UniProtKB/Swiss-Prot annotation:
Transmembrane segments: none annotated. Belongs to the FBXO45/Fsn family. PANTHER family: F-BOX_SPRY DOMAIN-CONTAINING PROTEIN 1, SPRY DOMAIN CONTAINING SOCS BOX PROTEIN. Required in the presynaptic motoneuron to down-regulate the levels of wnd and restrain synaptic terminal growth at the neuromuscular junction (NMJ). It is found in: Synapse. Its main location: other. Coiled coil: none annotated. It comes from Anopheles gambiae (African malaria mosquito). This is F-box/SPRY domain-containing protein 1. The keyword Cell membrane does not apply. The lineage of its organism: Eukaryota, Metazoa, Ecdysozoa, Arthropoda, Hexapoda. Gene3D superfamilies: 1.20.1280.50, 2.60.120.920.
């Protein structure tokens, strides 16, 4: 039976493959890519009907009602971004994840700094994700990375992300880089570097091969922010203090050079 499958699998028309694969669970699709080159080629089309069906089935409809997912143009990329989005079980109790699955909302709680981590951490490879802050920044608005051991909430208005040796962050309010409770200089290294404006796109670039963390703003590379990162599992993380502020995060995959 297995030999018959291997013989006929490469010759099955794409429209028949779409019908067959539409009945499979997402976790089974990867195994299908290993059957033959023809099936692998089929799944390389990230906008085919199978990826479309999986995407529309799993990604909340709310996520498609604005331009949030335009940075990930294919159905497969949108699906992947959803599985990397904010973790509703790994955030401050003063934060909730909106129905679109990609945006967190900080409730207006006084004297609290509140954060959230992404669902999936990274220890190998190169990864990029986009962060967009909606609403006033307040006195603290930090974007960066953290391990699972970093605190995600604290009393007072405090640069929580970067406050210990388990987190690294860039405070968009004063352009300071933060780690282990210390400021590591102004970023980017420009005279009178412009401050972040609400709604601008921040792209975080984590290179686990070179152990660096970098940022882009509005598609302009700002330089390497942190070097010599330890070999740990890092999660996309933010920390905020302003009530009713909202922060969206969309995972992009491997960054494009140039």
């Amino acid at each position: 039976m297995e030999e018959d499958l291997m013989e006929y699998a490469p010759n099955i028309p794409d429209n028949v493959l779409e019908l067959i694969f539409s009945f499979l669970k997402l976790q089974d699709l990867r195994n299908c890519t290993l059957v033959c080159k023809s099936w692998y080629r089929f799944f390389c089309d990230e906008n085919n009907e199978v990826w479309r069906a999986q995407c529309l089935q799993k990604v909340p409809a709310e996520a498609f009602k604005n331009d949030l997912l335009t940075v990930v143009p294919t159905y497969k990329a949108k699906l992947r971004a959803y599985f990397h989005a904010w973790n509703p079980f790994d955030c401050s109790r003063h934060v909730y994840i909106k129905p679109n699955g990609f945006t967190l909302h900080r409730n207006p709680v006084a004297q609290s700094t509140d954060g959230s981590r992404g669902k999936i951490g990274f220890k190998h490879g190169r990864h990029a994700w986009e962060v967009r802050w909606e609403g006033p920044l307040g006195t603290v608005a930090v974007v960066g990375i953290a391990t699972k051991d970093a605190a995600i909430q604290c009393h007072g208005y405090y640069a929580l992300l970067g406050a210990d040796d388990q987190s690294w962050g860039w405070n968009l309010v004063d352009n300071l880089l933060l780690h282990n409770g210390d400021a590591h200089g102004i970023y980017p290294l420009l005279n009178n570097a412009p401050k972040y404006k609400v709604g601008e796109r921040i792209r975080v670039i984590l290179d686990c091969d070179e152990n660096t963390l970098s940022f882009e703003k509005n598609y302009e590379f700002l330089g390497v922010a942190f070097t010599d990162l330890p070999e740990k599992n890092f999660y996309p993380t933010v920390a905020a203090v302003y009530g009713n502020t909202e922060i969206s995060m969309v995972y992009l995959g491997a960054p494009l050079d140039g």
